[in-house]
UniProtKB/Swiss-Prot annotation:
InterPro entries: CENP-T/H4_C, Histone-fold, Histone_H4
GO cellular component: nucleosome; nucleus
The name this protein goes by in its record: Histone H4-1
Compositionally biased intervals (Gly residues): 1-14
Quaternary context: The nucleosome is a histone octamer containing two molecules each of H2A, H2B, H3 and H4 assembled in one H3-H4 heterotetramer and two H2A-H2B heterodimers. The octamer wraps approximately 147 bp of DNA.
PANTHER family to which the protein is assigned, alphabetical: HISTONE H4
Subcellular locations according to the entry: Nucleus; Chromosome
Protein role: Core component of nucleosome. Nucleosomes wrap and compact DNA into chromatin, limiting DNA accessibility to the cellular machineries which require DNA as a template. Histones thereby play a central role in transcription regulation, DNA repair, DNA replication and chromosomal stability. DNA accessibility is regulated via a complex set of post-translational modifications of histones, also called histone code, and nucleosome remodeling.
Disordered, as annotated region: 1-20
SMART domains per UniProt: H4
């Protein structure tokens, strides 16, 4: 009955174990700095300076895009009955976005 040892995979865990608390993160989108957005624009082919309103709009669009990618990646993971999101899940989610 050897087995590999280690923790069990799909069990319920310890009796009476607490659920892991997930920290609520707010305003992390401001971590996408103005110079970072400018570099992305340069890489995308923009040559002129950007208007001040562009930065907030870019942050909002990026946030929505990433939320959709993460949602799709998690959906792929759940469908495969896994708990870990793999790089392939993210690749498939990105391909689905277009």
């Amino acid at each position: 009955m050897g087995g590999k040892g280690g923790k069990g995979g799909k069990g319920l865990g310890k009796v009476g174990a607490k659920k892991r608390h997930r920290r609520v993160i707010r305003e992390n989108i401001q971590g996408i700095t103005k110079p970072a957005i400018r570099r992305l624009a340069r890489r995308g082919g923009v040559k002129r300076t950007l208007s001040g309103l562009v930065y907030d709009e870019t942050r909002n669009v990026l946030k929505v895009f990433l939320e959709n990618v993460v949602r799709d990646a998690v959906t792929y993971t759940e469908h495969a009955r896994r708990k870990t999101v793999t790089a392939l899940d993210v690749v498939y989610a990105l391909k689905r976005q277009g």
